[in-house]
Regions:
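Flexible, acidic/Gly-rich N-terminal and inter-domain linker regions that tether
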Residues: 1-43
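N-terminal pre-triad scaffold of radical SAM enzymes
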Residues: 34-66
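Conserved alpha-helical substructure of the radical SAM core
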Residues: 41-47, 68-100, 110, 117
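Short acidic/polar capping segments at secondary-structure boundaries
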Residues: 54-58, 68-72, 105-108, 140-141
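A short secondary-structure junction signal
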Residues: 60-64, 73-77, 185-186
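Conserved AdoMet/S-adenosylmethionine-binding subsite of the radical SAM
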Residues: 85-88, 92, 108-253, 257-265
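Residue-level recognition of the N-termini of beta-strands and the immediately preceding loop/turn
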Residues: 98-100, 130-133, 170, 271-275
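Auxiliary Fe-S-binding modules of radical SAM enzymes
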Residues: 219-351
Length: 351
């Protein structure tokens, strides 16, 4: 019975925390007229995420992908929107936004002619607050032919050039999970062609048990990325969704891997930050392990926060070598982390 199989599968999916960090409850914005924009997220002041409905698939279906609800056919769990005009209107209503991140799925699944409809709408609006367009994509590593031999490869690159020539910074947020992904000639040529448009490529990846939990590999990967003209950006902690128990790396171990790799690279690769958790309060950066008044603690800070005043404030958790997520940590001093009361007051649906 296909219906029964689908029902059971969906029940299991709903148990896997499909929208961690309050994405569906807290991040969905609305226009001043009350229209909910379910194809967008606005968690941090300066940046909004846009999910074009045509990009809700991907070149790769990574088992560790935290965007898996976009792919499984449960429409009520999807973020998707067709209206570029509503994106423009929202940016007009929110002058604090400087960056728009196209995400999915993968925006580079779209034909160039369709993607340019969205980017042209942004450029034609001449929004004074829009400084950067970001594109989150796995295509550079998984399907470099998008920029080489696909029927719309040249059109894609011309669109990139158009964005750059408009005075808008274009950042390709490329997902590279392992050094091996940088080894082929098509990858290298795709990177070269993208950079020739004036776009910058910033690289990021989660730290994954069984795949890339090796400091030497990370150091070599960052070095190779720099040699190809890319900018190492983030090492993420696997999110609390899907197969986290398989791919997750304890935070203490993750920080040690990051620190060991960081020490092996020159300053040009030290643009990278991590390990970082995209949790409900914001991007939580694991700074390391220390000792305060004889107590061993994990030192953390927020790189981004739902409230900008939270950013950069150090806070401390009791040392726990098994913790793999913020929710596993206990405050080292006092009963709560410094942001918890405000989080509960302003964001009561999940806090």
């Amino acid at each position: 019975d296909k219906k029964e199989i689908a029902r059971v599968a969906n029940d299991i999916r709903l148990q896997l925390n499909p929208h961690p960090a309050g994405q569906m409850e807290l991040n969905v914005p609305q226009l001043k007229d009350g229209t909910k924009l379910y194809g967008m997220q606005h968690k941090y002041d300066e940046t909004c995420l846009f999910f074009p409905s045509q990009s809700q698939t991907c070149h790769a279906y990574c088992t560790f992908c935290f965007r898996w609800p976009q792919f499984v056919g449960m429409d009520e769990m999807k973020f998707a929107m067709r209206e570029g005009e509503q994106l423009v209107q929202y940016l007009k209503e929110h002058p604090e936004i400087s960056d728009v991140l196209f995400t999915g799925g993968d925006p580079m699944i779209m034909k160039a002619s369709m993607f340019s409809v969205y980017t042209d709408a942004l450029l034609d609006a001449k929004l004074p607050n829009l400084k950067t367009i970001r594109i989150g994509t796995k295509a550079v590593s998984y399907w470099p032919y998008k920029f080489l031999t696909d029927s719309d490869a040249d059109e894609t690159l011309k669109n990139f050039e158009k964005i750059v020539k408009s005075g808008t910074h274009l950042a390709i947020m490329a997902h590279f999970n392992h050094l091996v992904e940088l080894s082929t000639d098509p990858i290298k040529e795709a990177i070269k062609r993208i950079r020739n448009t004036g776009a910058q490529i910033r690289t990021q990846s989660p730290l994954l048990a069984h795949i890339n939990d090796d400091a030497d590999m990370w150091a070599k990967m960052w070095q190779k990325q720099v040699s190809l003209g890319c900018i190492p950006y983030y090492m993420f902690v696997v999110r609390d969704t899907g197969a986290q128990q398989y791919f997750g790396v304890p935070l203490v171990k993750a920080e040690k891997i990051f620190r060991t790799a960081f020490r092996k690279v020159s300053g040009l690769a030290r643009t990278v930050r991590g390990p970082s958790m995209s949790a409900t309060p914001g991007k939580v950066h694991v700074l390391g392990v220390s000792e305060i008044n004889g107590q061993k603690v994990i030192v953390l800070q927020l790189l981004q926060g739902r409230e900008s005043e939270w950013v950069g404030v150090p806070f401390f958790a009791k040392y726990d070598e098994n913790a793999i997520w913020l929710d596993d940590l206990v405050p080292a001093f006092g009963e709560k982390f410094f942001f918890e009361d405000e989080l509960k007051t302003k964001y009561t649906k999940t806090a």
